[in-house]
Amino acid sequence: MLQTMKTLTLIPARLGSTRLPNKPLADICGKPMIVHVADRAAAAKLGRTVIATDSEEIFKVVAAHGHEAIMTRGDHESGSDRIYEALAKLDPSGEVDAVVNVQGDLPTIDPDTIRRALLPLEDGPADIATLGVEITVEEEKTNPNVVKIVGSPLAGNRRLRALYFTRATAPYGEGPLYHHIGLYAYRRSALERFVKLGPSPLEKREKLEQLRALEAGMRIDVEIVKTVPLGVDTQADLDRARTFCSQAGTI
């Protein structure tokens, strides 16, 4: 159950984005984007919230805004590797049961959406939990940047057991298609196993890290939510986040 599962929320952050340089420090309504994400993650109240970064600049900015950060190596190939290093440093005694990995480019994410990512771990047998939303925009069904979930419905269609993730349009036939949201909750043992696995053939083909877990026989359950949080990858995305902030008065 949630109240007995000791959880750590980690936000990986680096400055190496090529499409949007210095992305975590981009200003949104007078506050760096990574701080907006940390505020949202902390509001979810899933245990301790820590930013894992290889940047001293990010570390200092986060600390100046009252959040905890930890320095990690600069040679990690993925956010999963970075959060595993952070977990080992923050909890060497192994007391943490689950780790929630919140992407550092989701400045408008609802804290309740973050909380929902943990549900498949607290009441089911999944190794890894993540989020999805039904696709309602026709163009997104064929957009390779919108990752689709192929899964078996569980719990009255509010959850899926993931069978595959793909950039193609799938599954074929009548019925809803689901957009994958890249926010994960891992059982500690699952994260430890995942990072020790090498990149898998389908992972490399689709360029989707989560396929490594499925190819290794790990179970991923997907909690269905109502909206896709705004991910900031480009200047246009950043402009949308700033517009949202100015219209809402806050994020």
From Swiss-Prot:
Task: Specify the domain of life of the species encoding this protein.
Answer: Bacteria
The keyword Membrane is assigned to this record: no
- Location within or outside the cell: Cytoplasm
Q: What is its EC number?
A: 2.7.7.38
SUPFAM superfamilies assigned: Nucleotide-diphospho-sugar transferases
* Biological or metabolic pathway of the protein: Nucleotide-sugar biosynthesis; CMP-3-deoxy-D-manno-octulosonate biosynthesis; CMP-3-deoxy-D-manno-octulosonate from 3-deoxy-D-manno-octulosonate and CTP: step 1/1; Bacterial outer membrane biogenesis; lipopolysaccharide biosynthesis
Gene Ontology cellular component?
cytosol
Catalytic activity reported: 3-deoxy-alpha-D-manno-oct-2-ulosonate + CTP = CMP-3-deoxy-beta-D-manno-octulosonate + diphosphate
Main location (coarse class) = cytoplasm
* GO MF terms, alphabetically ordered: 3-deoxy-manno-octulosonate cytidylyltransferase activity
Picking any one GO biological process from the record gives: CMP-keto-3-deoxy-D-manno-octulosonic acid biosynthetic process
| Residues making up the signal peptide according to the UniProt record | none
* InterPro entries with a match to the protein in the record: Cytidylyl_trans, KdsB, Nucleotide-diphossugar_trans
Sorted UniProt keywords: Cytoplasm, Lipopolysaccharide biosynthesis, Nucleotidyltransferase, Transferase
Instruction: Respond yes or no to whether keyword Transferase is given for this record.
Output: yes
PANTHER family xref list: 3-DEOXY-MANNO-OCTULOSONATE CYTIDYLYLTRANSFERASE (PTHR42866), 3-DEOXY-MANNO-OCTULOSONATE CYTIDYLYLTRANSFERASE, MITOCHONDRIAL (PTHR42866:SF2)
Q: Which family does it belong to?
A: Belongs to the KdsB family.
Q: Which HAMAP family match?
A: KdsB
- What does this gene product do? Activates KDO (a required 8-carbon sugar) for incorporation into bacterial lipopolysaccharide in Gram-negative bacteria.
NCBIfam families per the record? kdsB, PRK05450.1-1, PRK05450.1-5
Q: What is the protein's name according to its record?
A: 3-deoxy-manno-octulosonate cytidylyltransferase
Tell me the organism.
Brucella ovis (strain ATCC 25840 / 63/290 / NCTC 10512)
